[in-house]
Design a protein with these regions (language model features):
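Sec-dependent N-terminal signal peptides of Gram-positive bacterial secreted proteins and lipoproteins
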Residues: 2-24
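Proteolytic processing hotspots in large secreted/extracellular or virion-associated proteins
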Residues: 24-29, 102-153, 158
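Proteolytic-maturation and junctional protease-sensitive modules
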Residues: 129-193
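Short, polar/proline-rich extracytoplasmic segments that appear immediately after membrane translocation
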Residues: 24-57
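Sterically constrained small-residue positions within well-ordered secondary structures
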Residues: 14, 35, 45, 74, ...
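Self-processing/autoproteolytic domain segments and adjacent N-terminal interaction modules in large
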Residues: 51, 55-131
């Protein structure tokens, strides 16, 4: 009986510690809510300045909570999620966040940021190929319903690690949407200040 109590106690302790790590790095709903919609036509800009539009309906955004997501995308999202959880905090998972905030003169400690949305972004194959060319970007507008003036940090999961975007590539609009200039697609995390 004592051994059973010890085992149950250990399981409960591990569960409580996992919840604490989760609570520090993610909003409670990140694994339960739908992905934000794309609000308008996206624009691909090549290094030479040429532009191509991509219809919003051709951009697929799927949340970590999505039920019908391609197995490869789900595996990559799960891996991206686990990197933050296993590190124990955003500061440990993405040390570059501090530098990004400092360069943008944003006075928000990394410890105060949480992931509010974790999604996979996919585009048609011709756009994927275009983004492989150095200097080519796509600007996508996501319906996040955040207030103008809110600090929104965006990270992209690249080669097994999170890479924060320079804040000059993220624009919060008056309508609550957020324009993000990306140099690739795949898992994307939106971070906001935990208030």
């Amino acid at each position: 009986m004592k051994n059973l109590v010890r085992v149950v106690s250990c399981v409960l302790l591990v569960a409580m510690l996992s919840v604490a790590v989760f609570a520090d790095s993610f909003t409670a709903s990140v694994t339960q809510k739908d992905a934000p919609a794309v609000t308008k036509t996206a624009e691909v800009v090549a290094a030479d300045g040429s532009k191509v539009e991509v219809k919003a309906s051709d951009i697929k955004v799927e949340s970590v909570a999505a039920k019908s997501i391609a197995p490869e995308a789900k595996a990559e999202l799960d891996k991206a999620y686990d990197v933050i959880v296993k590190a124990g905090s955003l500061e440990k998972a993405v040390p570059e966040l501090k530098t990004v905030l400092k360069e943008a003169k944003i006075d928000v400690p990394v410890a105060n940021l949480v992931v509010r949305d974790l999604v996979n972004v996919s585009v048609p194959e011709d756009v994927v190929k275009a983004l492989e060319t150095e200097g080519t970007t796509i600007t996508v507008s996501f319906k996040l319903d955040v207030k103008e003036g809110t600090t929104v940090v965006v990270m992209r999961f690249v080669d097994g690690k999170w890479v924060p975007l320079a804040l000059e590539n993220v624009t919060v609009n008056k309508d609550g949407s957020v324009d993000v200039k990306l140099d690739g697609v795949g898992p994307i995390a939106f971070l906001v200040e935990n208030k």
